[in-house]
Amino acid sequence: MKIAHLSDPHLTSLDPVRWRELLNKRILGYLSWRLRRRRAHSREILSRTLAHLAGQQPDHLVISGDLTHLGAASECREAETWLNRIGAPDYISIVPGNHDRYIAADPEQTLGRWRAYMQSDPDAAARGPQFPYLRVRGPVALIGLSSAVPTPPFYASGRLGEEQLQHLSHLLEATAQQGLYRIVTLHHSPHSMSSRRGLSDAGALLSTLAGPGAELVIHGHGHRQMQATLQAGARRIPVFG
């Protein structure tokens, strides 16, 4: 089973965004994009990356968030078109990033457009809210978490919340009993970071993972490739970002 991981493509353009959509925290992100980010995130490089991945013939693609810059409706439509072009929902699993929920917004016009790519299999053991979701592909259990929450200006932190962590624990236990290789995906790093950029309940996530465990955790957010180990109680869990 070969799984590809892509994160933080920031693939959208902000040219269609209306000025009235920027009369909030988004204006800071817009200025960052206008002055710097639009040159840092190249569609050509993304296209080459996807072509390389296609050559590797992965069985599944996981995208760990930040498809957009500001989570605006026009961006989410553009990202939806891009997702539909590169693969079907049963081939691609995504979780949202902090840029995808930059501010509180109508989910039907924003993240809801990607729902088919971040929902449980129809017969999965997942019950309750959308996250965490469970998708089983061969011997692998793909468990997707959402750490994306609206934050104040100059903050890019994330949070999972008690309810999501409780459901995560149940899914990890159920899939362990099935003998599946469990991959947990979220946008923010599970390691401790600054309060401005980190996962606020990273400690609670560690406690959850310390029980049933997981075989692998993958994340994005840092805009750099990394490989580490997460110490969750007596367990050492590989982490790729």
Question: Model regions: which residues?
Answer:
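Extended active-site neighborhood of metal-dependent phosphoesterases/phosphodiesterases
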Residues: R77-H167, S207-A210, G233-R235
